[in-house]
From Swiss-Prot:
Belongs to the universal ribosomal protein uS15 family. SUPFAM superfamilies: S15/NS1 RNA-binding domain. It comes from Pelargonium hortorum. The keyword Ribonucleoprotein applies. Gene3D superfamilies: S15/NS1, RNA-binding (1.10.287.10). Part of the 30S ribosomal subunit. This is Small ribosomal subunit protein uS15c. GO terms for biological process: translation. The lineage of its organism: Eukaryota, Viridiplantae, Streptophyta, Embryophyta, Tracheophyta. InterPro entries: Ribosomal_uS15, Ribosomal_uS15_bac-type, uS15_NS1_RNA-bd_sf.
Length: 90
């Protein structure tokens, strides 16, 4: 698996202060999702990695829905910075 450097969306100071914040957790999940997606492009039949990807996607989706309920402005900023599509409301 080739690791590619990602542009830091959150500054280094914010990383040190807010490791438990929703934004930081979503950023970490997004990095993992990108890494696993690139792995799955090479290894299409790696079903264990597919399962892990689905679990991480679900965790990120739950965090994003929590953030959208609590603070819509922070949610909009985060999805714009990370280039994530806005989830469909049911």
């Amino acid at each position: 698996m080739v690791k590619t450097p990602l542009i830091s969306v959150i500054s280094q100071e914010e990383k040190e202060k807010n490791r438990g914040s929703v934004e930081f957790q979503v950023l970490c999940f997004t990095k993992k999702i990108d890494q696993i997606s690139s792995h799955l492009k090479l290894h299409r039949k790696d079903y264990l990695s597919q399962r892990g990807l689905h679990k991480i996607l679900g965790k990120r989706q739950r965090l994003l829905s929590y953030l959208s309920k609590k603070n819509r402005v922070r949610y909009k900023e985060l999805i714009n910075r990370l280039n994530i599509r806005e989830s469909k409301t049911r």
